Amino acid sequence: MKFNKHLQNIKTYEAGKPIELVVREYGIEPQDIVKLASNENPLGCSPKVIDAVGKILTKMSLYPDDSMISLKNALSKRYNVDSENVIIGSGSDQVIEFLIHAKAHSGSKILMNSITFAMYEIYSKHVGADVIRTSSQEHDLDEFYELYKQEKPEIIFICTPNNPTGDALDAQKIYNFLEKIDNDTLVVVDAAYMEYAIVKDAKKEINVKELIQKHSNVIYLGTFSKAYGLGGMRVGYGISEAKIIKELYKLRPPFNITTLSLEAATVALSDEEFVQKSTALNLEQMKRYEEFAKEQKIDIINSYTNFVTLSLGSNQNSTKIASQLLQNGMIVRDLSSYNMNAIRVTIGTQEQNSRFFKLVIKFL
């Protein structure tokens, strides 16, 4: 049987191992496993969300409100934009998929950082586009601009804060870069971890309203999977000029967000106290990782997210260490697939982080 020829060059995306799989593979009891691999909120989600979702369980037999008007209005209010500027996806990665299918085709060029979110490349290959990468690990917008002039890409991806490294750009640098890009090149600003970044450094915050008013070729992406603690609900969004959103809607399948997910995201957005609690805990515990890395003489990338990336020495192997941790009930992310001898560790609770420190020392 023949399949789309572009699939031959695509590797399946491997998400962080779920706890259930570790239970089956290693026979470790669930309560003895700590998952610090997928950048989930260690506090879970807002109690208000749990209460609200519980009250609508009887509606599961009904299709959701496909207009998603309550959530769109809530996001519009949060960012001070019109609802016509908002599209909701099953995770922000679905919006990324829409964008690439809407703008790129076989032979198109798509520009991204050398190390960044893997789904940009995977979706690019869906349509047979050519991926152009920078040479630097961190987002060097001067290099981005030089490659933009040389390659004339259809789409540019800027991931800030970046996954899986955690570094972030000052908003002003992004604004300056956008001034030099023509209106026919789509620029995607993926800000999945922005709630964490702005707590650490206010200079990272992007004024979304001004962004889309000044630039008709830009879309801003956000998600409920991280600071809001709704990774299992799969809700993300894009904010852009109404004309772009209208085109993306042509690719959106009906009822792509469930009734429970819509309710959860809408309520989560209203509970600012929970997000503040989550980001405060994250910043507090991040300092412990920075101190630990200094004590152990491990290179740590300055992170503006809810994870840290620990770069290992030449006498260490990230795959081996991640495997040793896994066998002891500690799930972290090996970054060897990004050509990095490093592990990415989600910042957990105080207890979870203490357990990681105590365990990883044995294998360093």
From Swiss-Prot:
Keyword Nucleotide-binding attributed: no
What is catalysed by this protein? Answer: L-histidinol phosphate + 2-oxoglutarate = 3-(imidazol-4-yl)-2-oxopropyl phosphate + L-glutamate
| Pathway(s) of this molecule | Amino-acid biosynthesis; L-histidine biosynthesis; L-histidine from 5-phospho-alpha-D-ribose 1-diphosphate: step 7/9
> What's the domain of life for this entry?
Bacteria
Name its co-factor(s): pyridoxal 5'-phosphate
What's an example GO BP annotation here?
A: L-histidine biosynthetic process
Which of the residues bear the PTM N6-(pyridoxal phosphate)lysine?
K226
The molecular function terms of the Gene Ontology recorded here are:
histidinol-phosphate transaminase activity; pyridoxal phosphate binding
Q: What is its EC number?
A: 2.6.1.9
Q: Which UniProt keywords apply?
A: Amino-acid biosynthesis, Aminotransferase, Histidine biosynthesis, Pyridoxal phosphate, Transferase
- What does the record note on quaternary structure? Homodimer.
Which HAMAP family does this UniProt record tie to the protein?
A: HisC_aminotrans_2
The family this protein is said to belong to: Belongs to the class-II pyridoxal-phosphate-dependent aminotransferase family. Histidinol-phosphate aminotransferase subfamily.
Q: What is this protein called?
A: Histidinol-phosphate aminotransferase
Which organism encodes this protein?
Sulfurimonas denitrificans (strain ATCC 33889 / DSM 1251) (Thiomicrospira denitrificans (strain ATCC 33889 / DSM 1251))
The primary gene name is: hisC
